[in-house]
Amino acid sequence: INQLSHDFVDIVQNRISELNPDMIIAGTDLVINKNGDIDTLCDLGLGDIDILAYDNNRKIVYSIECKRINFGRTPTEIRNERERFIRDSRNQSSWISKHLRRHQWMSYNKEAIRSYLELEDTDFTIQSFVVVSEDIALRYLESTDISIVTLDELTTML
């Protein structure tokens, strides 16, 4: 992962802290797999959570994917954007499908999340979304199972 992507994760993290000072940022770039930050029985190919945050007042765990992008202006770029975000040839490695699989795993494995966050119980919901560094045409052309928001729209998710 390049430095600009890491910088964007930091920007999103700082914005979350500004919008909700009580939000707990539990970690960034957390790997979910066997012997990872969040341990699983085997490597499931879930990748990492860019930002894991917890709102204790609302009992919500946030799984936030951060994408620093700079494309999608010409028809070819929009097509490529669509494939990267939503529709790859196997529908398994697009950014949205990976984030959705991670969200589903977290929803079915709340005990692992509870343990990582050191919470008393699993009485919380999980919300997942993608924050993009700039608006993309794709958001207006196709619906997705995971919300895509810009940095300026982050307040609507928290």
Give the residues covered by each predicted segment:
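Intrinsically disordered, low-complexity Ser/Thr/Pro/Gly-rich regulatory segments
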Residues: I1-L158
